[in-house]
A protein has these predicted regions:
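Bacterial N-terminal signal peptides that target proteins for export
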Residues: 2-12
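Bacterial N-terminal signal peptides
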Residues: 10-22
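Serine/threonine-rich, low-complexity intrinsically disordered segments
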Residues: 5, 23-26
Length: 177
């Protein structure tokens, strides 16, 4: 009788410990969502190099660096505010319409970073501005963000020739151990 009781108590303790560990793991991997907008005054094309392809009028290949800052109301990732976003990319547009491959470094206030790789589709709206839709995969991070994974979705408006870019972001992420 005593051995059954000891076994049952031991089994309950092991089961409780297993549940606590799995609950901790699921909390660590719980998906988080962050949504925010970046107005044009907080975005700047730092460098752009445009090459006319020459096969079709208006066909341009462009390499660029786009920096976005958060002077106020910064979003937080893992409870730390984002300080800056540094995007590098290459577009292949005909009259402002076409694909764009890009990489972004998200720099947090504590110096940690996470990275994404994405694809953007731009469409010329006819007013010199481009309507953009992007999807990016989070590829990793540093420090406490080492196991970060997730998706970055963006919609926006841009006019690279006028150094204008504004966007709305939705980041869904989790941190794996």
């Amino acid at each position: 009788m005593k051995t059954r009781r000891a076994f049952a108590l031991g089994a309950i303790a092991v089961l409780g410990l297993a549940l606590a560990i799995s609950a901790t793991d699921s909390l660590a991997q719980q998906k988080q969502r962050v949504s925010f907008s970046i107005p044009a005054e907080n975005s700047k094309y730092v460098q752009q190099h445009v090459i006319e392809v020459g096969d079709t009028p208006g066909h341009e290949v462009r390499v660029y660096e786009l920096r976005r800052s958060f002077p106020g109301n910064a979003p937080a990732i893992n409870a730390v505010k984002v300080k800056e976003m540094i995007g590098s990319g290459m577009s292949d547009y005909v009259d402002g319409t076409g694909p764009n491959s890009n990489y972004t470094v998200f720099v947090l206030e504590n110096g940690e970073k996470f990275f994404s790789r994405g694809t953007t589709l731009a469409q010329n709206t006819g007013s010199g501005k481009l309507s953009t839709v992007s999807v990016a995969r989070i590829t990793g991070g540093t420090g406490k963000l080492l196991g970060i994974q997730g998706t970055v979705r963006t919609t926006g408006t841009a006019n690279p020739k006028a150094n204008f870019s504004e966007a709305q972001y939705e980041i869904e992420y989790w941190i794996e151990k």
